[in-house]
Swiss-Prot record:
Pathway assigned to this chain's UniProt record: Glycan biosynthesis; glycogen metabolism
GO MF assignments: calmodulin binding; phosphorylase kinase activity
Post-translational changes noted in the entry: Although the final Cys may be farnesylated, the terminal tripeptide is probably not removed, and the C-terminus is not methylated.
Coiled coil region boundaries: none
Entry's Gene Ontology BP terms: carbohydrate metabolic process; generation of precursor metabolites and energy; glycogen metabolic process; protein modification process
Name listed for the protein in its UniProt record: Phosphorylase b kinase regulatory subunit alpha, liver isoform
Outcome of substituting T1114I: In GSD9A; type 2
Keyword Magnesium applies: no
Organism for this UniProt entry: Homo sapiens
Subcellular location per the Swiss-Prot or TrEMBL entry: Cell membrane
Comp. bias regions, Low complexity: 972-985, 1028-1053
Ways its activity is controlled: By phosphorylation of various serine residues and by calcium.
Subunit structure: Hexadecamer of 4 heterotetramers, each composed of alpha, beta, gamma, and delta subunits. Alpha (PHKA1 or PHKA2) and beta (PHKB) are regulatory subunits, gamma (PHKG1 or PHKG2) is the catalytic subunit, and delta is calmodulin.
Gene label: PHKA2
């Protein structure tokens, strides 16, 4: 034990240091700290970091106090902390209108300010005069508000302040998709005011959300009304994005020392210890110097070469700051604190000694931490040539309050005055600890007793919804509406949480609302918004994905409880049995494992003691919040209609329902629809009102009327049997079929009025007697085109029965009959949108995957590079899809599937930066045409009629890069649907050898071999000779000639002979797939960066990628990769794009040679053209015809597209010869001669 005198003396010394270097800047009225005596503004982030030393010293005094003076000193210091935190709270509460607006817009103009007036708590600069949007600063405030409250400080006083803090939670919970200016306030490192997604902001928001969740802001004096609620799905979004970004800091910064604050104290936001170590090592190796760490590479702040009269940099100017970036001592304080938390005494000692050596001695010998160390102006060139050799000079603020505070705090920790747990009472430091395996509790509930009896026949005993009363079961969308009430405050005009989708983490908790227990079904089972939940196989697939997600992402005390409802839509078509996919899934759940997840199947009553509970007391009767505060509360837009209610019949008795029950029933009833259309006839084939020929001719005759109306004129028309005679291809694949088949004349006519126009009233009368789904669709489509969606049909004399209502009912019937083409088309007419569309899009963008919708080129192909509001995103998709509304709906579907895969299998997207949805759809249709041996028109029809499960499966095989085949399957006899059934299977050695299954893998292997061979430029040119001479030699076992037009065959290493006919089209298809999904070899962008330093640029399809980009961007920046992609994506043909990538990879081999320059602008197109000509010459020389077919758009031989990368006739051979020939022309003095 240290003696009182020694510890007291040391603490008094720190108290003097705190007073003279930090508290002397504190305003006595507001409690805010000014940045310095010259700069009177108070930065939010700096204020919080600067007060940490005061907070820590107060706790140290309280722990070591055995005199009243020490206790008084501790109280004084703690109140200084409270005063500052409340001062920041007052600054933010004065901008409450911005908090309310930002929740909906996420606009930089609506953000809280980053700095305030120290004396008045007012703003100091305009909304657009500073990079105010800094999510990490607001998150840091919430994080330490939680930590300090948990330590015993009372900072929040009233329920109005509690409501404001709850809305700050909503403010930061979207951090995973908000591009901000980051902790250095500059955004993109060009300092041009461009916001970007920053890992430091995402990580700090994640930590704040986790820390403040379920925290009582009144501390020991509070109740349930002062508890803050956070939805776990928002936290997990941040976690997922953070994992995908690190160690990269942002789009323009490949590494940033600010990441220390999220991988260690104070955030501890990263749960993967390996990722923590990788990020830390990246910072040390790339940013650390003799005086601290530079903030990021090519940081020009306060360097001698920075122009202080200019706010922004020129892009090419960033190269000037290389190797002379200023070094900041503050980052060494992070390493000291990190060493204390991790128990690394060596790290603590090393960095304490290093920091002591660069501190500045002030008056009376006090130690001051300077802001930064800069290179002297007269030694810039010397430092640039020999980094870390020049002695630097201190610049900026002395002391730097942020660094000074962390220096004092680190000293208190290192010397034992504070324990790690005292400044981390919420135990954030254990984030990397091993978590126990999660067991997901699954309860299966039958919608009614009929379904319950059907399950019992199969030996599955479950409860019905009525059996678990008084526990209430509600769909997940009800929980979204309930949470929309959270945080409302009329005094401050706060509306609460915006209505948003709640994920499976949120619906896997049990909720206590007004002393009633509620369980909510996951939203993927909700059929009210989009048609994915109408496919039972898709529901089962989503259940598998969500169970695995729960096992991986559940962090709460207790087990997750997933309620899986079995509704009447999960029965067979005749309703006599349970759908086989659903039944087999229940069997797997009974085994205890499903999709790799540990599960426990049981009744809900068995899980009540082991589940996690959330108490939503903001809906208690004594709260000010009213459920029905306006007439339109809880209503749905027309796109949410359906006749599948499902949950209404088993709720509490009407007489005993309170306001909450009435509110829930109001929400449920708003999505229900009455039935107006006549029931369908089971034998639909014999009950058509119109013949196919008559309907075809007459529907075409009214199309002209659609042009004058404000409705889409859709050349694709309805995907029904009636209209299939004239349906055209979706412009996805080439079709040899004529656009419109000629139909014979007939005397039949649509019912006409006296003016010769279609009599819509008589059409409605015919609709009453129409019992065929296809005919009902035809009639409603004609009414939609002529009269519009809002026209009142007065069907059966009932007022208010609009065309849109009837289409909604038809949508439900089509879902029951699994008519997927019709479902997608009606979804387009009703402008239905996936509820999670914006979220899915954001997931992809946050994983650094840009999106395009529509077919190339621009401007028809729309680029999505930043998150968009749902309405704006839907509008953009429909615009990009042109007049084809089914493609617009399918685009939404594909985006959702891609988001599922990027979360569950991110490895599928390695080296993909831009996902081009239009090309992906095109490739899917092409694959169907190839595999099913049908025309483009038939393939397009088949694609639109695929079930969601089959569509997702087809997409997965395309993304996986594996060879696969598609076959037609026999549909069960009892099925009434006309949609085609296909089966997708991987292709083994039939048609492709194992070593050649993935073209890009073979290309990578070839690159490695050639890299070893091309150690010098002379060696490189000699390969051109060798390749030329070997073209006529006998083929080895690794030779591949799928392109051979002479009919010769090759054999694999196993001796199995594969005919050219069997393998024809294999590599063309492989290149088309890789080009469509923009897949490139690993390390491709870094190699392009290197080759650009040896030439003036690369010309691709008429567009130049200049070498000047390397002066702005570093090789590992996402920003550079996106720039390269933007040039490559100018090429509309995916297979040609992939050949260009292969040619560039050959070129980049020169970056490893001793050649200092390879000329001016290199035209990659010419190299590919030369390679194709060399290929043609060799083919002719071995007996092929000299009129081999060429691609009209590019002039490349079709057989060259279809050549494997390797082998004597492989594309690599010819591209290598072409590069050698091309560079020989550019470099005539190289001393190499081609023969």
């Amino acid at each position: 034990m240290r003696s009182r005198s020694n510890s007291g003396v040391r603490l008094d010394g720190y108290a003097r240091l705190v007073q003279q270097t930090i508290l002397c800047y504190q305003n006595p009225v507001t409690g805010l700290l000014s940045a310095s005596h010259e700069q009177k503004d108070a930065w939010v982030r700096d204020n919080i970091y600067s007060i940490l030393a005061v907070w820590g010293l107060g706790m140290a005094y309280r722990k070591n106090a055995d005199r009243d003076e020490d206790k008084a000193k501790a109280y004084e210091l703690e109140q200084n902390v409270v005063k500052l935190m409340r001062g920041l709270l007052q600054c933010m509460m004065r901008q409450v209108a911005k908090v309310e607006k930002f929740k909906h817009t996420q606009s930089t103009k609506d953000s809280l300010h980053a700095k305030y007036n120290t004396a008045t708590c007012g703003t100091v600069v305009g909304d657009d005069q500073w990079g105010h949007l800094q999510v990490d600063a607001t998150s840091l405030f919430l994080l330490f508000l939680a930590q300090m409250t948990a330590s015993g400080l009372r900072i929040i006083f009233t329920l109005d302040e509690v409501a404001f803090i709850q809305n700050l939670v909503f403010y930061i919970e979207a951090a995973y998709k908000v591009a901000d200016y980051g902790m250095w306030e500059r955004g993109d490192k060009t300092n041009q005011g461009i916001p970007e997604l920053n890992a430091s902001s995402v990580g700090m928001a994640k930590a704040a959300l986790e820390a403040i969740d379920e925290l009582d802001l009144f501390g020991a004096h509070g109740g349930r009304k002062s508890v803050i609620h956070v939805l776990p799905d928002e936290v997990e979004h941040c976690q997922s994005i953070l994992f995908s970004m690190l160690p990269r800091a942002s789009t323009s910064k490949e590494i940033d020392a600010g990441l220390l604050s999220i991988i260690s104290f104070p955030a501890f936001a990263v749960e993967d210890v390996n990722l923590v170590n990788v990020t830390k090592n990246e910072i040390i190796s790339k940013l650390q110097g003799r005086y601290g760490c530079c903030r990021f590479l090519r940081d020009g702040y306060k360097t001698p070469r920075e122009d202080p009269n200019r706010l922004h940099y020129d892009p090419a100017e960033l190269k000037l700051f290389e190797n002379i970036e200023c070094e900041w001592p503050v980052f060494w304080t992070y390493f000291i604190i990190d060493g204390v938390f991790s128990g690394d005494a060596v790290q603590v000692q090393e960095y304490r000694e290093a920091l002591e050596g660069i501190l500045i001695r002030g008056k009376n010998g006090i130690r001051l931490v300077p802001e930064l160390y800069a290179v002297p102006p007269n030694k810039v060139d010397e430092e640039y040539k020999n980094p870390h050799t020049v002695d630097r000079v201190p610049m900026g603020k002395v002391p730097h309050l942020w660094g000074q505070s962390l220096y004092i705090l680190s000293s208190l920790l290192a010397e034992g005055f504070l324990a790690a747990g005292e400044i981390d009472p919420l135990n954030r430091r254990f984030s990397t600890s091993v978590k126990p395996d999660v067991v997901v509790q699954v309860t299966v509930l039958a919608e009614n007793n009929h379904i319950k009896d059907l399950l019992r026949k199969h030996g599955v005993n479950v409860q019905s919804i009525a059996d678990i009363h008084p526990i209430q079961v509600q769909p997940g969308r009800i929980l979204s509406h309930i949470y929309a009430k959270l945080g409302r405050n009329k005094n401050m005009n706060l509306s609460g949480r915006p209505y948003r989708h709640i994920g499976v983490l949120g619906t896997s908790k049990l909720y206590v609302i007004r002393n009633q227990i509620f369980t909510f079904t996951p939203q993927f089972t909700d059929q009210h918004h989009f048609y994915l939940a109408l496919d039972n196989e898709m529901i089962v697939e989503m259940l598998r994905i969500e169970l695995a997600y729960l096992c991986t992402c559940w962090r709460m005390t207790g087990r997750p409880t997933l309620t899986f409802p079995i509704s009447r839509t999960m029965l067979t078509n005749d309703g006599s049995d349970i759908h086989s996919a659903v039944l087999s899934t229940i069997r797997k759940l009974e085994d205890g494992y499903f999709g790799g997840a540990r599960v426990k199947l049981g009744n809900l009553s068995e899980f009540l003691t082991t589940s996690f509970y959330t108490y939503l007391t903001f809906l208690d009767p004594d709260c000010d919040e009213k459920l029905f505060d306006n007439a339109s509360e809880g209503t749905f837009s027309p796109d949410s209609d359906s006749d599948l209610v499902g949950y209404l019949e088993d709720t509490c008795n009407q007489e005993s329902q309170d306001e909450l029950d009435h509110y829930i029933n109001h929400l449920l009833q708003s999505t229900s629809l009455r039935s107006y259309l006549p029931p369908l006839c089971k034998n639909t084939e014999d009950r058509h009102v119109f013949s196919a020929i008559h309907s075809t001719r007459d529907i075409l005759s009214v199309m002209a009327k659609a042009k004058g109306l404000e409705v889409p004129f859709v050349p694709m028309t309805l995907p029904t049997k009636v209209l299939s005679a004239h349906r055209k291809s979706l412009n996805l694949v080439d079709s040899p079929q004529p656009l419109l088949e000629k139909v014979p004349e007939s005397d039949f006519q649509w019912p006409r009025d006296d003016h010769g126009d279609v009599d819509c009233e008589k059409l409605v009368e015919q609709l009453k007697d129409c019992s065929n789904l296809q005919d009902q669709a035809d009639i409603l489509y004609i009414l939609y085109v002529i009269k519009g969606p809002s026209w009142d049909t007065n069907l059966s004399g009932q007022h208010g029965v609009t065309v849109q209502n009837l289409l909604g009912e038809l949508y439900g019937k089509a879902g029951l009959n699994q008519e997927w083409g019709l479902i997608r088309y009606i979804s387009g007419l009703l402008r239905k949108k996936v509820e999670v569309l914006a979220e899915a899009c954001t997931d992809l963008l946050s994983h650094q995957k840009q999106l395009t919708v529509g077919l190339p080129p621009e401007p028809r192909e729309k680029i999505i590079s930043a998150p968009l509001p749902p309405e704006e995103l839907t509008k953009l998709i429909y615009e990009a899809s042109g007049q084809d509304i089914s493609i617009a709906v399918l685009t939404q579907e594909i985006v959702v599937y891609l988001a599922m895969y990027v979360r569950a299998q991110p490895s599928l997207f390695v080296e993909m930066l831009r996902l081009r949805i239009g090309l992906i759809i095109q490739v899917m249709a092409t694959e169907l045409a190839r595999s099913l041996n049908c025309s483009g028109e038939e393939a397009s029809e088949s694609l639109m009629n695929l079930s969601p499960f089959d569509m997702k499966n087809l997409l997965h095989h395309i993304l996986s890069g594996k060879e696969f085949g598609v076959e037609r399957s026999v549909r069960p006899i009892h099925s009434s649907t006309s949609s085609p059934t296909i089966s997708i299977h991987e292709v083994g050695h039939t048609g492709v050898t194992k070593t050649e299954r993935s073209g890009i893998n073979r290309l990578r292997s070839e690159m490695k071999q050639m890299t070893r061979r091309f150690s010098a430029d002379e060696q490189f040119f000699s390969v051109g000779q060798a390749a030329s001479s070997s073209a006529h030699s006998s083929k080895s076992a690794r030779s591949s000639t799928p392109s051979s037009p002479t009919g010769t065959s090759s054999s694999d290493s196993g001796g199995h002979h594969i005919g050219w006919g069997e393998r024809q089209g294999q590599w063309l298809r492989r290149r088309r797939l890789d080009g469509a999904i923009n897949r490139v070899p690993v390390g491709f962008y870094q190699r392009v960066w290197k080759i650009l330093q040896k030439c003036h640029g690369l010309s691709i399809d008429g567009y130049v990628l200049p070498s000047s980009t390397t002066r702005e961007m570093t090789p590992h920046e996402i920003k550079f990769a996106v720039h390269v992609e933007s040039v490559l994506n100018r090429v509309p043909q995916p297979e040609y794009r992939q050949l260009l990538v292969e040619a560039i990879m050959v070129l980049t081999l020169l970056s490893d040679t001793e050649m200092t320059s390879i000329g001016g602008i290199i035209h990659v197109d010419q190299i590919v053209q030369m390679a194709s000509q060399l290929f043609l010459q060799d083919q002719v020389s071995i007996g092929a015809m000299d009129t081999l077919e060429k691609d009209q758009a590019t002039g490349i031989c079709h057989f060259f597209y279809d050549s494997a990368p390797s082998g004597a006739y492989g594309t690599m051979t010819y591209l290598t010869r072409a590069v050698a020939s091309y560079l020989q022309e550019l470099l005539p003095n190289s001393g190499c001669q081609m023969q």
